[in-house]
Every structure is written in structure tokens, then in C-alpha cells.
Regions:
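Conserved catalytic core of the tyrosine transesterase superfamily
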Residues: 1-310
Length: 310
């Protein structure tokens, strides 16, 4: 499975997630080999997740995609009819959105890299993993753009680079260059390159432009190759920093890193930008995904005068 996952350009995280779901599927069916099972067993497992484990629709879809990968890509079963699965219910939850003042207050409570990353989440609409995976070459200071490479959906997109972040980002890249120079001096400095680019461009892995904008403090072993490399900062560090900032700022919302992205979209719509523009900046394939923010705009009767107020 590992070789096929790498050939299909699955991220390491997706590969591990699929492997865990396939393992659960096998154990659910008494440790029988998947090739000895069929669509009926897949239906039973997915229905079990919805009915007995009460998983969310997104979790059930994740399991479905893992099994689809197993049968179509690994076992080469093109015909796999799994109609009739009991689907988990989609909960219609509105996203948590910060006010502009709240977003600014939260960012002000954060320090160093975490503050800069939060600024990119809110100012550029990045997902947390898109932010921590940014490479030096993805930032275009001259054009005021950020290229989001192969984000969710395997499609590159362009979003804005906030003017207020240009100077702190330049300072961050100076730190990265110094760290990279030191790594090279010690015999390291090669970074993971996606899609077998390392085999195509032998020396690219050590080029500064491919380095992460937010590198980890310590070197670590790459689980793909066993080589010692410098990975990017952990997204969990940023998540914890956001939770701490929420508490210190006294903001009583169940916010997270993704709330900055929600706020980015909502505030653009409030400022009069059209939904298609926001869709492109967010990288949504379907405009219906972006439409959820119009519900946030209308929440609480916003824009409608209460009869109690005369």
C-alpha cells in the first residue's frame, strides 16, 4: 500500500489515516484479508460507523475514501457497488467567526512565529497546514501574493500577501536562511521534496528556496526515507497558542486556527467582495462551500431592524 500511496502523491498524514481505517475494517471483519471480502462487507462497516459509533458525516466519508483507495488502487477492483449505506447525518453548524477586533486582539496576544502564522490564517485565508507547509519560493513579495501549492484538493491557488506581513516575513526568512546555512555547514540542509522532485533535481533539496518558511526547532528523521531533515513547525503548537490567546484575551468563543480562515472569508463578504472572488481565494471547488459564510452574515438578524427598537 505504501508504494501506491506515494505513487498517487498522498500526503504522509493521509497515508497514515487510510492505513488506520483499513486496519479497523479488517478487524471489524474478523481479521480477514480484504480480497476475501466484498461490497457487502464495506457497506456493513460504513453503516456500523454511522449507526453504532455515531461518527460524523466527514468521518464516515474519510473511512469510505480509505476503503475506496484500498479496493480500486491497491487491489485493482474497479467495480465496487456500495450503494445502500446508512449515511451519517450532516450537521449544519455555522462556523465560529471572530470580529475584526477579536482577530486583532488574538494575534496581538501571540508571539514570534505563532503570531506570524495567525496573521497568515486571517490575512490570507490559509488553512493551518497550508501555512506551516509554506516554502520560501511560495512568497512573492513583488506581486504581493502567496502561492498555495497543492493544498486540499490538489490544486494550487493564489491569495494575497498582506502588506503588514511583508516586513515580519522578510525577517523570518532571514532567520530561516541563517538556520539553513548552519544546517548545510553541519552536513544537513536537505529538505523533503514532493512528487519525486528530489530524483529529478538532484540538488534542489538543499536550495534555500525550497526550505520551509516556518522550520522546526530540531532536526528529525524523515519517516519516508529515514534521513535526518528539518521538518516544518508542528501545527499543534499553533493550535495551543491560539487556545492560550483566547483565554488570555477573554474571548468566550470555541475558536481555533480555522476560525481565522472563517473570519477572513466573512469579513471579505462584509466588505462587499463578491462570493466568486472569495471562493477563489479560499480554494473551494464548489461555491456552495463558500456560501456557508452568507449564513454567518445573516446570523442574529444582522441587517434587519428589530421591531422592539422601533
Amino acid at each position: 500500500m505504501t508504494d501506491i500511496a506515494r505513487f498517487r502523491h498522498l500526503s504522509l498524514r493521509t497515508e497514515e489515516t487510510y492505513r488506520n481505517w483499513i486496519k479497523r475494517y479488517i478487524f471489524f471483519n474478523g481479521k480477514r484479508h480484504p480480497k476475501d471480502l466484498n461490497a457487502e462487507h464495506v457497506r456493513a462497516f460504513l453503516t456500523h460507523l454511522a449507526v453504532n459509533e455515531h461518527v460524523s458525516a466527514s468521518t464516515q466519508n474519510q473511512a469510505f475514501n480509505a476503503l475506496l483507495f484500498l479496493y480500486r488502487q491497491v487491489l485493482q477492483w474497479e467495480a465496487l457497488d456500495i450503494q445502500g449505506v446508512e449515511r451519517a447525518r450532516h450537521s449544519r453548524r455555522l462556523p465560529v467567526v471572530f470580529t475584526k477586533a477579536e482577530a486583532s486582539a488574538l494575534i496581538a496576544q501571540m508571539n514570534d512565529e505563532n503570531r506570524l502564522i495567525a496573521g497568515l490564517l486571517y490575512g490570507s485565508g490559509l488553512r493551518i497546514m497550508e501555512a506551516v507547509r509554506l516554502r520560501v519560493k511560495d512568497i512573492d513579495f513583488a506581486r504581493g501574493e502567496i502561492i498555495v501549492r497543492d493544498g486540499k484538493g490538489e490544486q494550487d491557488r493564489v491569495t494575497m500577501l498582506p502588506q503588514t506581513l511583508k516586513h515580519p516575513l522578510s525577517e523570518q526568512l532571514a532567520v530561516v536562511r541563517e538556520l539553513h546555512t548552519d544546517d548545510l555547514r553541519r552536513g544537513y540542509g536537505a529538505i523533503y521534496l514532493p512528487y519525486a522532485l528530489e530524483r529529478k533535481y538532484k540538488n534542489a533539496a538543499k536550495d534555500f528556496v525550497w526550505q520551509y518558511v516556518f522550520p522546526a526547532d530540531k532536526l528529525s528523521i524523515d519517516p519516508r526515507t529515514g534521513e535526518i531533515r528539518r521538518h516544518h513547525i508542528s501545527e499543534q503548537n499553533v493550535q495551543r497558542a491560539v487556545k492560550t490567546a483566547l483565554r488570555i484575551a477573554g474571548i468566550k468563543k470555541n475558536g481555533s486556527c480555522h476560525s481565522f480562515r472563517h473570519s477572513f472569508a466573512t469579513h471579505l463578504l462584509e466588505d462587499g467582495y463578491d462570493i466568486r472572488t472569495v471562493q477563489e481565494l479560499l480554494g473551494h471547488k464548489d461555491v456552495r462551500t463558500t456560501m456557508i459564510y452568507t449564513h454567518v452574515l445573516n446570523r442574529g438578524g444582522r441587517g434587519v431592524r428589530s421591531p422592539l427598537d422601533g
